[in-house]
Amino acid sequence: MRSPRTRGRPGRPLSLLLALLCALRAKVCGASGQFELEILSMQNVNGELQNGNCCGGARNPGDRKCTRDECDTYFKVCLKEYQSRVTAGGPCSFGSGSTPVIGGNTFNLKASRGNDRNRIVLPFSFAWPRSYTLLVEAWDSSNDTIQPDSIIEKASHSGMINPSRQWQTLKQNTGIAHFEYQIRVTCDDHYYGFGCNKFCRPRDDFFGHYACDQNGNKTCMEGWMGPECNKAICRQGCSPKHGSCKLPGDCRCQYGWQGLYCDKCIPHPGCVHGTCNEPWQCLCETNWGGQLCDKDLNYCGTHQPCLNRGTCSNTGPDKYQCSCPEGYSGPNCEIAEHACLSDPCHNRGSCKETSSGFECECSPGWTGPTCSTNIDDCSPNNCSHGGTCQDLVNGFKCVCPPQWTGKTCQLDANECEAKPCVNARSCKNLIASYYCDCLPGWMGQNCDININDCLGQCQNDASCRDLVNGYRCICPPGYAGDHCERDIDECASNPCLNGGHCQNEINRFQCLCPTGFSGNLCQLDIDYCEPNPCQNGAQCYNRASDYFCKCPEDYEGKNCSHLKDHCRTTPCEVIDSCTVAMASNDTPEGVRYISSNVCGPHGKCKSESGGKFTCDCNKGFTGTYCHENINDCEGNPCTNGGTCIDGVNSYKCICSDGWEGAHCENNINDCSQNPCHYGGTCRDLVNDFYCDCKNGWKGKTCHSRDSQCDEATCNNGGTCYDEVDTFKCMCPGGWEGTTCNIARNSSCLPNPCHNGGTCVVNGDSFTCVCKEGWEGPICTQNTNDCSPHPCYNSGTCVDGDNWYRCECAPGFAGPDCRININECQSSPCAFGATCVDEINGYQCICPPGHSGAKCHEVSGRSCITMGRVILDGAKWDDDCNTCQCLNGRVACSKVWCGPRPCRLHKGHGECPNGQSCIPVLDDQCFVRPCTGAGECRSSSLQPVKTKCTSDSYYQDNCANITFTFNKEMMSPGLTTEHICSELRNLNILKNVSAEYSIYIACEPSLSANNEIHVAISAEDIRDDGNPVKEITDKIIDLVSKRDGNSSLIAAVAEVRVQRRPLKNRTDFLVPLLSSVLTVAWVCCLVTAFYWCVRKRRRKPSSHTHSAPEDNTTNNVREQLNQIKNPIEKHGANTVPIKDYENKNSKMSKIRTHNSEVEEDDMDKHQQKVRFAKQPVYTLVDREEKVPQRTPTKHPNWTNKQDNRDLESAQSLNRMEYIV
């Protein structure tokens, strides 16, 4: 069974894995920061919108001030990539936002800075490009969902801004309203650099031990190094090859090595007199041999065994032989025969022979058998206080440390005699030391170090100058005091005049002026013309609470900022490519010439022969239409690696790190802040500095006595190595230089920006500043200059690089195709004809006697009629007919016009000679009352009878039509003849009646008071055409489409036309069917006769006289089909057409007696009910079988009915049209 301790071990690797994932996640973060904007103040005195209207709607007629509520002001912000020519379109690629409603017409929020209501924060997660374009708009909230919000004023700004805690203030002082705002860019926590894309988070754990400096560079904690500061610095001197460490100051040896610094190898075990270069070697010392170096190869030299000046010779390992001098013998010459003869005593020693050899009496300072050993007078050490003893012959010498003196260093030395104190009041000798009494401001043993009195003294970003025993704070503007701790109150002197409120700010004040005053001190009456809001040279007139711009003739708008479109309201004439003529009352000629603006806003047009032109461009622009901004960066005027950004007839250099100036020609003095401590001398480098340290100080800034490396020595993750007299930085990839401060490979090489875009280096990333006409991260998206569509009158817009061209449709001209070309300008019409200009053409209205497209053709002979001369081709109306003169012959349409309507009370003159005004019969009054209505008739004029009979169809030379009218849409006093006269005057009869004689007669219906039966007949019918059918079809079409302006047609509710039945195509069945039908008919007659006889016998007194039948104009009742028009449902212009074929059937009614009142009344009642209750108007064409006619047989009326209910209707052949 596992112990709990054993089970818990997997948690440690898991925690390490999680920590590693967190570290990797932190590395993925590319950039993080935020763009902040704060609204400071708003001044919209009149409460107006950008279009000049009031926020509340109405104005006071007296002073023209807005009288209703103030504006509900809020702001919108759009942040996008840098644009040299700011355009409002396109996405807000860097972000957008808005505030809530924060005030009315005028407000000031400077005293409440930090309020989130007037602040807009746009976070970003990309490398901040430094260059930007900002659009700020003030809006009036409508506070409802119906009316849209309205814009008050807008401002745009393009520039550069680096991340900083400081605010940058911007103002909008033109237009309707003035407002002030401030912006800044700040990096999120742990993000640094100009692009907020340098990530550095302090840590002290397994993955690193470092802090972060103000530039985001990792500064390793003491004892650590490496890009991630996770490599411990070993004990100084530790062999980098054979030693390592996991903790600072440690030195752990590899296997086979030993020593304090792991620089000594371990020899072979048992090696006696040998060394090693690699572990486990035994390299013998001189005169030693053997596998373990334990064999003495120089026994004579090592042991000196031969005595009495005997000569020793090595004969083998550990072997020797002594050659004795005269008087001595023995293996080691130890036996003396005449020992003193050889003078064995050295160093002035005296020899005495003895029985065993000799004996030496040594002189002072020497000892040993032969007086060859110097007596060590330094043993024991006679020197005190750490003095070093040097042995002499019969004596010694003490070398004393500086603090001591005397023969045996027993006396204290006076160090003050050497005057070691530099900036001291006095020097005091101490035992084994001294003490310097330093002057104020100095420290150190010798009082040679100036005390840094500046640490933590100056406030509010003031700079401190260190003095001797003191400091001086150099305060930034707006602060005072010894420590710059006091904000100077600029309002103490009450500088604001005229009741203005003074608001104290840092190094300045602002006067909040009351209404009616302006200026820095509220000393001026508000002059709305200063600064001049009027553009394009317009003159500004100051008013009590507003201003007025008197615009030049070519501009319009509140501020004269919009180019006036003269051709919008006044006809224009194209003179040439540069000039357009327009009517004007300001010139004696009545014509003013204006520019066509073909060269755009940056050029002037010059006309040339042949309709050509050239553009004289303003400075900074070129191209056919002056649409191209000249690249002022060509030739690269920026030096020392600076990046050039092109402007309009100008350029701007963005300098590399370490350089400044208009052309980046000046090296920034990195020594200006005096970074070298303790008297070190600073030498300026490019984007770096070097400190020449003194008095034993070391490091990048002379801050340490122990190491050349400090936390800021190597930049950009470089690793610092202490090399005693100097330091060396090991730079990571992409950086070089003594302190890793120079980028090796620029992210702009090769240039990633397309289409002439400028690449700006931003750390290890880049930003593209695109030329006009291009946009996108790398300037690959062509700006759509055709959006919104600038070409009028169906002109085609051709998009170019920062330009567009309108290709006009035929008949139009001008840069935006707004001008209709006057084709009548060349006077193309002949003989004084009138020319009417049209789009891409013209029309000539010819004078009498001329014809043709240009009236150059002379017409034929004139006509003389009714005593008047009529020119050839002329037309005139003659009652209901139209006449025309055709080469001397008068040709008129042939429509019978009927009796002329007249008014009884007007007396003579209304009727032609021989006719009189006869009152209209009561049954002829269609829309009552018809008081005073009459018709012109003569006693000799007989009524015209048409050739229509009850079995006539409009395929013949006759048509029977029944019109049902909506009398509510008709004027009172209309007679049947009035309606018939309007039908005869329809334009559709003009062309048809020129070839045929047309007769139209009308009778009121006896079955319904809102119906009129119309009979149309024609004479002179030819085989190649049927005018009656054509007229009938045109009338049906006119009613169904509600065509024309006739009030009569508009009042028609239903039309019924009698159709011809289809002929049987099976010819051989005709005789058979005729026989069958004849027999059947006879049977029916017999049956009917029998039934009538029986009925009369049952009811002999039930018969009465029947009402006269409605036979149209011939007293014959037609068999009709329904024509209905759905105008009440679908309107008067268009009517949908539907096919309801096979959905209706005929309901037959058989009548056996012509005089039966019940059946006749029932028939009339059914018609009235049917016509009165059908609200939907339909047009029905029906073809049906016609029963055989008898003199007493009346045609059947048919109702629409579902054909699925009557099987008998399946044999009928019909056609229906619903219009």
UniProtKB/Swiss-Prot annotation:
Residues 34-1067 are extracellular. It is found in: Membrane; Cell membrane. Residues 1189-1200 have a biased composition (Polar residues). Residues 199-207 are annotated as: Important for interaction with NOTCH1. Residues 230-263, 264-294, 296-334, 336-372, 374-410, 412-448, 450-485, 487-523, 525-561, 586-627, 629-665, 667-703, 705-741, 744-780, 782-818, 820-856 form the EGF-like domain. The keyword Transmembrane applies. The chain crosses the membrane at residues 1068-1093. Residues 1094-1219 are cytoplasmic. GO terms for cellular component: adherens junction; apical part of cell; apical plasma membrane; membrane; plasma membrane. One of its GO terms (biological process) is cardiac right ventricle morphogenesis. Widely expressed in a variety of tissues. It holds the Pfam family EGF. Keywords: Calcium, Cell membrane, Developmental protein, Disulfide bond, EGF-like domain, Glycoprotein, Membrane, Notch signaling pathway, Repeat, Signal, Transmembrane, Transmembrane helix. One of its GO terms (molecular function) is molecular adaptor activity. It is a single-pass type I membrane protein. It comes from the Eukaryota. Ligand for multiple Notch receptors and involved in the mediation of Notch signaling. May be involved in cell-fate decisions during hematopoiesis. Enhances fibroblast growth factor-induced angiogenesis (in vitro). Seems to be involved in early and late stages of mammalian cardiovascular development. Inhibits myoblast differentiation. May regulate fibroblast growth factor-induced angiogenesis. This is Protein jagged-1. It comes from Rattus norvegicus (Rat).
